[in-house]
Amino acid sequence: MFAIFEVGSKQYKVQKGDVIYVEKQDKKVGESISFDKVLMVDATIGKPYIKNATVSCKVEKQGKQKKIFIIKHKRYTRSLKRQGHRQPYTKLVVTGINVK
């Protein structure tokens, strides 16, 4: 059984036991979280979401991605601006797909 659900502005296709990385969620490690914006379960398609369907997940890790560097350079003036950014994420393990 698979499901497609929405977190923030992104959609994820998952099965039970899958590990996904989503935008930062305000939950502690070990807590469970459930998402109700389920777009599709197997052959059932929602309009836009399926009522009474949830995807349950367990928070495995809160972390930050690898640092990316932004460099802005202006020619002729020897000016250079460097900036770094690390995007926070939440690592989730799918524990169940529930349809009532």
Swiss-Prot record:
Pfam families on file: Ribosomal_L21p
Keywords attached to this entry: Ribonucleoprotein, Ribosomal protein, RNA-binding, rRNA-binding
Subunit structure comment from the entry: Part of the 50S ribosomal subunit. Contacts protein L20.
Family: Belongs to the bacterial ribosomal protein bL21 family.
Record-linked PANTHER family: 50S RIBOSOMAL PROTEIN L21, LARGE RIBOSOMAL SUBUNIT PROTEIN BL21M
Entry-linked HAMAP family: Ribosomal_bL21
GO biological process: translation
Coiled coil: none
Biological source species: Malacoplasma penetrans (strain HF-2)
UniProt protein name: Large ribosomal subunit protein bL21
Gene Ontology CC annotations of this record: cytoplasm; ribonucleoprotein complex; ribosome
UniProt function note: This protein binds to 23S rRNA in the presence of protein L20.
Example GO molecular function: structural constituent of ribosome
